[in-house]
């Protein structure tokens, strides 16, 4: 016998590291090493070994015929590796012939251009290649890496499926194997003639099995054709599962039509590896007729079944060392309570259904089914102890996230780790599963918009965690999402506190919209997969039929390699709000499926109707989108543009609509509410006047003094002048003569001419009384308007005295110019700035939060509160979205009060008197006093409840819309 010497015409070259052995005694370990690598065996007496070898192969591959399961198919062959010299021996069982063009798993070493050594070792184990020559006969014994039974990959997969059969035999499961073949010069995955199992009670699974046999999926790395679910798993070497295959797009799951017809729902696919090798040998697929969110039992069962036959699926091969985890855990677990407390606060204040904390798996010491040596350092997963789930339905999504780890770059969380930016997705369910792997689970849980925020280490600025906030399920409107995004960003800026972590306020924010990848697939993939016939991708023009759509402009800009930004502009003294916009997760081209794409973009089309501007900027090679303008030409960076209508809407025009709601006024003027709010801010109006005030205890004179104290007002503003255009309304308590109700919208062009100029308001009636968008009554006597504040106050006082039996509430308009504190840094909730390029940070001149001193009040609506309970005192921020109940909870939490009900809250008013705070109306009045007095802090005292309780608040109506 000689080892390691090539010769003859054999197809395989032996290992030639060892020379010819001498006749001396050899070390047995060295001999084992030699045989382990393979060797040639040669005879010199001319005796043929064909018959002997055929018998050996047949004996080694014979199956046990006692296992007669008509729904479990496995095929064992002694392969004809050298057609000129070896006859094909069948095993003891008879099987249908394999059609020409389909190669068997044992032929992989010759036909599939993967890792030849690894494939040969698994597929050629215990197989022999013979050569004949005049001098004798020789044959090659291939190396055997497996320490398990002498069997092929297919044999072992059959055994593994038999083991799975015991676990799922009574369930509605179809288990099938996909193995690689070569056809027409391309590599494919096929399940035809491969092992499979299904429960015969479910005829739909039998039909779906027949459908799957007709499909071949490409297994080439550089293919642009649809690879399907098995192909993705095979190429990426990562498992993939979905709760419902109907959520796939047709290019992601070409069998989707047949799956719907066969009532197929859940699907799980795992790659199969030889133990100790990184070469993927095939894919195990499980489908079921039920919708499944949790596949952990099936994952564990498949992994155990594969390990029992010396195969494996994905797993972590190199977990972090114990020393690393011990050092990191000191930092890691110290930060979790801080993160959890902050997420709890945010979820309670904004009514979020879910808030997740993500961290690298390596730093958690967490293992998962998607791990490998190559990606373990890039894998991230949820920190379950730091996830807040107020919504019960969202708990299933948390379980899915804990089970399905993400790689850096996948989803907005993976991108936040990778790019160190804030990422916002208006609708997560519109993304493909490749771009957002948890999109299907989010759809079942009813989740939509999400924001990913990276948390950095204060010492080295590395990203330690990523927080993922899911917006309320009802927050679907673009404007509502914008308001929520700004308000939530203000909270992130102002209220996050940690010893070791911080949120970088100079980060950019990217708003990500879905864009399809260009893929090609055939209706009959078995016929056309190799030729590519009748597979034409839809052109870009078919994706969006309307050239005016800002989505189509954005897509075209992205296709040309241009950056795209989304901006909301405010007044000149405020920084421009600008959001980075990416049209997908990578730079893939846009392809087929225009109908579905349009449906995904419908939610953003509303913005166009509100006056969204699109600017193609040649200097930046970017598209800028802003509120309030139509399609314009290029402009230089930093320039501001306004529509003619917006420029010409003055204070006189606004006054005509103060009696009604802000939304009605916006509709009448012809702008969206957001634009109207901005116009009001330009005129110094920070809150729409027609809101409901609950108490009459403060005179209009005090309000007039506040208004007069504001610098920069052009001309004197009198309170009674705001209501001269109120509609007439008859009242038995009023002395007015008019009895008809006149609609202020009856003015020409709603108070604005066709050219956008203000129409002259009608002369005011001598006396009028009106109900303003609620139950509050507003009165004015404008026959002889006076600029004297005392006259206005006396007039209202006289009316109140004459109508003591009527319910009369104080009417007041808060008019403050935005020039107050111009030099002070604007709050994030109003001036959040997101720039397209790195030189424009997320926050222009971002406010730094001092570590050991209280922060200045910002202009975003948040209020400082100082609460006292006995000798204890605390300070905190009253967010603009809080109500009385949230204030109670925060005070109870700060003072560790289990039940706040037995306690009374009192606030210090402008007369230095303690007034009970019992409801929303009282809280609103408290905030009004705080703002009117220019006080920096709201003072609240907590007392034990008194025996005598006062009656309910007079007219509890909520605050008007905040500007």
UniProtKB/Swiss-Prot annotation:
Amino-acid biosynthesis among keywords: no
**Does 4Fe-4S appear among the keywords?**
no
Against CDD domains, the record matches this protein to:
PB1_NLP
User: Where does it sit, as one GO cellular component term?
Assistant: nucleus
PROSITE patterns assigned to the protein according to its UniProt record, in alphabetical order: PB1, RWP_RK
Q: Where in the cell is it found?
A: Nucleus
Q: Which InterPro entries match?
A: NLP, NLP1-9_GAF, PB1-like, PB1_dom, PB1_NLP, RWP-RK_dom
Which residue ranges does the record assign to the RWP-RK domain?
A: 635-716
One GO MF term attached to the UniProt entry: DNA binding
Coiled-coil zones: none
Boundaries of every PB1 domain copy? 862-945
- Which intervals of the chain are annotated as region Disordered? 734-794
The record's Gene Ontology biological-process terms are:
regulation of DNA-templated transcription
Q: Which UniProt keywords apply?
A: DNA-binding, Nucleus, Transcription, Transcription regulation
The record ties this protein, via Pfam families, to: GAF_NLP, PB1, RWP-RK
**SMART domains with a match to the protein in the record:** PB1 (SM00666)
Q: Where is the composition biased (Polar residues)?
A: 734-755
Spans of biased composition, class Low complexity? 756-794
Per the entry, what this protein does is: Probable transcription factor.
The protein, known as: Protein NLP2
This protein's species is: Arabidopsis thaliana
């Amino acid at each position: 016998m000689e080892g390691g010497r090539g010769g003859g015409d054999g197809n395989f070259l032996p290992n030639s590291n060892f020379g010819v052995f001498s006749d001396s005694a050899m070390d047995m370990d060295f001999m084992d090493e030699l045989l382990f690598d393979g060797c040639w065996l040669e005879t010199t007496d001319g005796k043929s070994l064909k018959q002997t070898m055929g018998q050996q192969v047949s004996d080694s591959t014979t199956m046990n015929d006692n296992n007669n399961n008509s729904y479990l198919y496995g095929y064992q062959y002694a392969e004809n590796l050298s057609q000129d010299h070896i006859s094909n021996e069948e095993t003891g069982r008879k099987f249908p012939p394999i059609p020409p063009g389909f190669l068997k798993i044992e032929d992989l070493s010759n036909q599939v251009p993967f890792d030849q050594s690894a494939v040969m070792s698994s597929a050629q184990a215990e197989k022999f290649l013979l050569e004949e020559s005049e001098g004798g006969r020789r044959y090659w014994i291939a190396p055997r890496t497996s320490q398990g039974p002498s069997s092929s990959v297919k044999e072992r997969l059959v055994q593994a499926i038999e083991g799975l059969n015991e676990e799922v035999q009574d369930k509605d499961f179809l288990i099938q194997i996909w193995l690689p073949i070569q056809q027409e010069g391309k590599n494919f995955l096929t399940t035809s003639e491969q092992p499979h199992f299904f429960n015969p009670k479910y005829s739909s699974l039998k039909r779906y099995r027949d459908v799957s046999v007709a499909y071949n999926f490409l297994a080439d790395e550089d293919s642009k054709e649809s690879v399907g679910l098995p192909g993705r798993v095979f190429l990426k070497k990562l498992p993939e599962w979905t709760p419902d295959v109907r959520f796939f797009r047709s290019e992601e799951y070409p069998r989707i039509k047949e799956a719907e017809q066969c009532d197929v729902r859940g699907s799980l696919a795992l790659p199969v590896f030889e133990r100790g090798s990184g070469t993927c040998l095939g894919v195990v697929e499980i489908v079921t007729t039920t919708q499944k969110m949790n596949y952990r039992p099936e994952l564990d069962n498949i992994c155990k079944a594969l390990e029992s036959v010396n195969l494996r699926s994905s797993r972590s091969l190199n977990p972090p060392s114990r020393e690393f985890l011990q050092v990191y855990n000191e930092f890691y677990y110290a930060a979790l309570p801080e993160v959890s407390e902050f997420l709890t606060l945010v979820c309670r204040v904004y009514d979020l259904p879910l808030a997740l904390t993500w961290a690298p798996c390596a730093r958690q010491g967490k293992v998962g089914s998607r791990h490998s040596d190559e990606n373990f350092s890039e894998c991230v997963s949820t920190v379950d102890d730091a996830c807040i789930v107020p919504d019960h339905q969202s708990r299933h999504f948390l379980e899915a996230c804990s089970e399905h780890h993400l790689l850096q770059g996948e989803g907005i969380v993976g991108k936040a780790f990778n790019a160190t930016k804030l990422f916002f997705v208006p609708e997560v369910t519109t993304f493909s599963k490749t771009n957002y792997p948890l999109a299907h689970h989010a759809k079942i849980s009813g989740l939509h918009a999400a924001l990913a925020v990276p948390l950095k280490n204060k010492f080295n600025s590395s990203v330690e965690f990523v927080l993922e906030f899911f917006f309320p399920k009802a927050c679907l409107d673009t404007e509502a999402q914008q308001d929520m995004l700004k308000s939530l960003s203000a909270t992130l800026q102002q209220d996050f506190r940690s010893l070791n972590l911080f949120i970088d306020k100079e980060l950019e924010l990217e708003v990500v919209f879905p864009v399809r990848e260009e893929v090609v697939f055939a209706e009959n993939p078995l016929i056309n997969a190799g030729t590519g016939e009748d597979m034409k991708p839809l052109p870009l023009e078919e994706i969006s039929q309307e050239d005016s759509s800002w989505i189509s402009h954005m897509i075209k800009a992205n296709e040309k390699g241009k950056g795209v930004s989304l901006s909301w502009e405010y007044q000149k003294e405020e920084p421009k709000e600008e959001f980075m916009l990416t049209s997908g997760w990578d730079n893939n081209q846009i392809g087929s499926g225009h109908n579905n794409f349009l449906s995904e973009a419908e939610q953003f089309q509303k913005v166009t109707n509100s006056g969204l501007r699109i600017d193609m900027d040649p200097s930046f090679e970017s598209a800028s989108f802003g509120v309030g303008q139509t399609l314009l030409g290029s402009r230089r960076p930093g320039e501001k543009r306004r529509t003619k209508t917006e420029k010409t809407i003055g204070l006189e025009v606004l006054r005509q609509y103060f009696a009604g709601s802000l939304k009605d006024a916006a509709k009448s003027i012809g702008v969206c509410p957001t634009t109207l709010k901005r116009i009001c801010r330009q005129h110094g109006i920070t809150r729409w006047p027609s809101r409901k005030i609950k108490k009459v205890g403060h005179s209009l004179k005090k309000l007039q003094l506040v208004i007069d104290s504001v610098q920069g007002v052009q001309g004197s503003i009198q309170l009674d002048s705001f209501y001269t255009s109120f509609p007439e309304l008859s009242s038995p308590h009023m002395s007015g003569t008019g009895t008809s109700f006149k609609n202020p919208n009856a003015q020409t062009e709603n108070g604005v001419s066709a050219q956008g100029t203000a129409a002259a308001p009608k002369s005011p009636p001598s006396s009028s009384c009106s109900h303003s968008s609620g139950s509050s009554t507003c009165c004015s006597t404008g026959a002889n308007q006076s600029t004297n504040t005392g006259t206005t106050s006396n007039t209202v006082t006289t009316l109140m005295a004459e109508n003591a039996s009527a319910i009369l509430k104080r009417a007041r308009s808060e008019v403050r110019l935005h020039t107050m504190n111009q030099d002070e840094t604007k709050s994030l909730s109003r001036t959040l700035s997101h720039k397209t390029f790195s030189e424009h940070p997320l926050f222009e001149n971002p406010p730094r939060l001092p570590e050991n001193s209280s922060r200045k009040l910002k202009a975003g609506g948040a209020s400082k509160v100082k609460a006292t309970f006995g000798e204890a005192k605390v300070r905190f921020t009253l967010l603009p979205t809080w109500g009385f109940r949230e204030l109670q909870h925060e005070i109870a939490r700060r003072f560790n009060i289990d039940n706040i009900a037995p306690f009374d809250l009192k606030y210090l008013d402008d007369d230095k008197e303690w007034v009970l705070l019992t409801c929303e109306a009282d809280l609103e009045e408290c905030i009004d006093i705080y703002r009117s007095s220019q006080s920096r802090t709201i003072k609240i005292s907590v007392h034990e409840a008194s025996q005598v309780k006062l009656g309910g608040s007079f007219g509890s109506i909520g605050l008007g819309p905040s500007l």
